């Protein structure tokens, strides 16, 4: 009887860890890909006024950047209204890899949690 309790307890702990990672990844994904939050911030933080760029230009370039971060997008990052340095390009490639790992971890932990 004690062996069953121990196996069950270990399973519960592992499931809790997978669910925790799943929820953290979900929170990151929602925050990054929820464009309306940034659209709100353009006005709320007065980004257009402080940069001298129109809301439309900021939003269009942000949309391109967010699309680039998706695991499903395999092209290069080309912002329509901004020139990017080589170090800037490297930075965004590294950030994309981080977000891809978060998206993969989200899917894997979700599947594992569902079948446990």
Q: Model regions: which residues?
A:
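Alpha-helical transmembrane signal-anchor/signal-peptide segments
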Residues: 32-51
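Hydrophobic secretory-pathway targeting helix
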Residues: 1-38
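Transmembrane alpha-helical segments in integral membrane proteins
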Residues: 20-23, 103-116
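Residues that form generic nucleotide/phosphate-binding pockets
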Residues: 30, 64, 68, 95
């Amino acid at each position: 009887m004690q062996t069953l309790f121990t196996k069950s307890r270990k399973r519960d702990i592992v499931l809790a860890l997978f669910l925790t990672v799943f929820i953290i990844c979900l929170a990151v994904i929602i925050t990054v890909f929820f464009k309306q939050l940034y659209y709100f911030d353009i006005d709320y933080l007065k980004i257009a006024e402080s940069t001298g760029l129109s809301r439309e230009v900021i939003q269009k370039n942000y949309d391109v950047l967010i699309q680039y971060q998706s695991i499903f997008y395999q092209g290069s990052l080309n912002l329509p209204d901004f020139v990017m340095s080589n170090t800037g390009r490297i930075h965004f490639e590294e950030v994309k890899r981080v977000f891809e790992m978060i998206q993969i971890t989200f899917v894997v932990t979700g599947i594992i949690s569902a079948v446990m």
